[in-house]
Amino acid sequence: MKPVIALVGRPNVGKSTLFNRLTRSRDALVADLPGLTRDRHYGEGRVGERPYLVVDTGGFEPVAKDGILHQMARQTRQAVEEADVVVFIVDGRNGLAPQDKSIADYLRKTGRPIFLVVNKAEGMKYTAVATDFYELGLGDPRAISAAHGDGVTDMINEALEVAYAGQPEEADDDDPSRGIKIAIVGRPNVGKSTLVNALIGEDRVIAFDMPGTTRDSIYVDFERNGKKYTLIDTAGLRRRGKVFEAIEKFSVVKTLQSISDANVVILLLDAQQDISDQDAHIAGFVVEQGRALVIGVNKWDGLDDHARDRAKADLTRKLKFLDFAKSHYISAAKKTGIGALMRSVDDAYAAAMAKLPTPKLTRALIEAVEFQQPRRRGPVRPKLRYAHQGGQNPPLIVIHGNALDAVTDTYKRYLENRFRETFSLTGTPLRIEFRSSNNPYADKG
């Protein structure tokens, strides 16, 4: 699985700036999705062929009477303890603060590899920046400027060397004994463990690997209606007797890793609770990772007609950027709606892995343009000439032509909807990439 790097520090030391710099390559993928909040605390970065997950743990502002452990949210502590590397950020301009010492004392006890990073060091000599922070006892400080990018690449490369060294050997994704990899994600108490038992059943478990530590994943291989699946369990599920129970401990780190490792994600919501920012953040990460998605709205049997209408309206309003995914209203406890949910899992996986022939893509593009041409931008009208597939999981459609920088987001969504309709691409994000050339020979040879 992708290693996790946790960003830690008191408020206003530049964690968000560093987070944005580390994840900037991913932001553009979801920035134009209507309804998706940009206020995220986790994302993906990549250095060469090495991807990693980043968690911004928020700011710590300890007060004397409570101490640092009381000020740190449970989720923050858990994220730090489960991360592969902790990047502890301090402020080079303002120097060492009492809060820094409190945080350092806590971090030393976690046993995690810690990188002490002095931010806002632009224009300052290293000795002047670093001297005070040796007092924290966390080794040599690394001076960076998150705002300007100075020193960031070297720092993250060092962190990844440590993070990847601790990663177990990757399982073979092409192993024929493994079926579609499914991650069931959601807040605590939405019914994840109940859904697992409804899917697997007491006699359907083929293999169960008990983790060596709480930071490992559990893979459960099972069959349903003659099809093979692999459940990636990062929700704290443990087997008790012949069934699974949930240790109700929501883990951001485990959720991110399970989404990254999955072929299809089931986002489980509680019909009896309003959709939260946490639900939307998880959903946004699924889209950012390009994972196929099915939405399960659980505990549907407990609602009257009025409450059901309200729940559907809440889903449409708050998660409208997931309009490509099918929603199923289920009761995991009563095992109603599970069959249809799993059929959508199969369909979403098929759509994510679909092969789209160039002639058919180009024909669909031409028909879309003939039905509705892109708007002019000044004297220029974009010319969309042909399309081909650039990747799978999620499908990537590359469109070639002239002046494609002038294509609006609205027209891009129009094309996406046309491609979805033509090729039945339900349940998967779809990427469209434009490649302009004013040189008629640029796309040849």
From Swiss-Prot:
GO terms for biological process: ribosome biogenesis. GO terms for molecular function: ATP hydrolysis activity; GTP binding; ribosome binding. Coiled coil: none annotated. GTPase that plays an essential role in the late steps of ribosome biogenesis. This is GTPase Der. GTP 1 binds at residues 9-16, 56-60, 119-122. PANTHER family: GTPASE DER. Belongs to the TRAFAC class TrmE-Era-EngA-EngB-Septin-like GTPase superfamily. EngA (Der) GTPase family. Associates with the 50S ribosomal subunit. The gene is der. Residues 354-438 form the KH-like domain. HAMAP family: GTPase_Der. Pfam families: KH_dom-like, MMR_HSR1. The keyword Nuclease does not apply. It comes from the Bacteria. Keywords: GTP-binding, Nucleotide-binding, Repeat, Ribosome biogenesis. CDD domains: EngA1, EngA2. Residues 3-167, 180-353 form the EngA-type G domain. GTP 2 binds at residues 186-193, 233-237, 298-301.
